[in-house]
Design a protein with these regions (language model features):
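Membrane-interface helix-loop junctions and terminal tails of multi-pass membrane proteins
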Residues: 1-188
Length: 188
């Protein structure tokens, strides 16, 4: 992928919209679930998996639709991207993720700047994140090689499943993990 203002804009917008949906659907899910955390998580999960399909379909042809420093690192390790370009991608993804959290807060009339209070650390959480990120990259690489058109759907489905089989709800994405620390909502 060649680094251009257009590719960086695609990464920024895609990551921002992803986080707006992650946080916004968490707020909506919690609001509508009446205290049932499983229902709130289900709403959050479905919205996140669905938006990933949409965003990858939209931005994949422009930037590769990484939206994730781990995916970008994978591209570098496979020789598909220069390290210098990957740094620009990762920084853009981080800024986009924070912007998406702020956008979700604004849409729900919440304080824009928050600090998350959910403790998401410990050996199990870190192991879950490693498994989630490995599985995500494996899903992408496998699909790109054998069925490139399936990538958006496979990624959306993998993350949907990952919400439920990992202790961390499958962040699988350092930009998401960092940005979610800036929300005091269900998704934080």
């Amino acid at each position: 992928m060649t680094l251009t203002p257009r590719t960086l804009t695609a990464e920024f917008l895609g990551t921002a919209l992803l986080l707006a949906v992650v946080v916004g659907s968490g707020v909506m899910g919690e609001t509508l679930a009446g205290g049932n955390v499983a229902i709130a998580l289900l709403g959050n999960t479905i919205a996140t998996g669905a938006i990933l399909v949409v965003l990858i379909l939209i931005f994949g042809p422009i930037s590769g639709a990484h939206f994730n420093p781990a995916v970008t690192l994978s591209a570098v390790l496979q020789g598909e991207m220069r390290s210098r370009d990957a740094v620009a991608y990762a920084l853009t993804q981080m800024v986009g993720a924070v912007a998406g959290v702020f956008l979700a807060h604004g849409m729900f009339d919440l304080e824009i700047l928050q600090v998350g209070v959910n403790v998401r650390t410990g050996p199990g959480q870190w192991l879950a994140e490693g498994v989630a990120a490995f599985g995500l990259v494996l899903t992408i690489i496998g699909c790109v090689r054998k069925a490139p058109g399936a990538v958006p759907y496979a990624v959306g489905l993998y993350i949907t499943a990952g919400y439920w089989f990992t202790a961390s709800t499958s962040f699988a994405n350092p930009a998401v993990t960092i940005a979610r620390a800036l929300t005091e909502t269900f998704s934080g």
